[in-house]
Swiss-Prot record:
Gene3D superfamilies: 3.30.1320.10. Belongs to the bacterial ribosomal protein bS16 family. It comes from the Bacteria. GO terms for cellular component: cytoplasm; small ribosomal subunit. Keywords: Ribonucleoprotein, Ribosomal protein. Residues 82-135 are annotated as: Disordered. This is Small ribosomal subunit protein bS16. GO terms for biological process: translation. GO terms for molecular function: structural constituent of ribosome.
Length: 135
């Protein structure tokens, strides 16, 4: 299977990458079938050979996740929702909903406690007034 992946080159700690088409079993920095572009993560510079990339995708080449993101930014692929993103967002939404319910419950309990305390104070003041009028 042909993969579209990034091939690292450049100095230590100053990596740049070439977008290459290669066999999925070959090494990351091995000889590619074809060089399709360039990506520098420091400067965010990206150069893509759009015709060659479309040709490789038409032949069934599978891009890696990072390459897919670059191609989506370049307008060569439509943005797709990946299953892991869907699951993560669903978990986050469920957590937010549970937190909101918990906060609402705590607020209701605090309001009820405040109302009970106010009622107790009112009873205490009423009983104090009645004792003072009796005596």
């Amino acid at each position: 299977m042909i993969k579209l992946r990034l091939k690292r080159f450049g100095k230590k700690r100053e990596a740049s990458f070439r977008l290459v088409a290669c066999n999925s079993t070959s090494r990351r920095d091995g000889r590619p079938l074809q060089e399709l572009g360039f990506y520098n993560p420091r400067t965010k510079e990206t150069r893509l050979d759009t015709e060659a990339i479309r040709e490789r995708l038409g032949q069934g080449a599978q891009p890696t996740d990072v390459v897919r993101t670059l191609l989506e930014r370049g307008g060569l692929l439509e943005k797709t929702v990946r299953p892991a993103e869907t699951v993560g967002k669903a978990k986050q939404a469920a957590k937010r909903e549970a937190d909101a319910k918990q906060a609402a419950k705590e607020a209701a309990e605090a309001k009820a406690a405040a109302a009970d305390e106010k009622a107790a104070e009112a009873e205490a003041s009423d009983s104090a007034e009645s004792e003072s009028t009796e005596g």
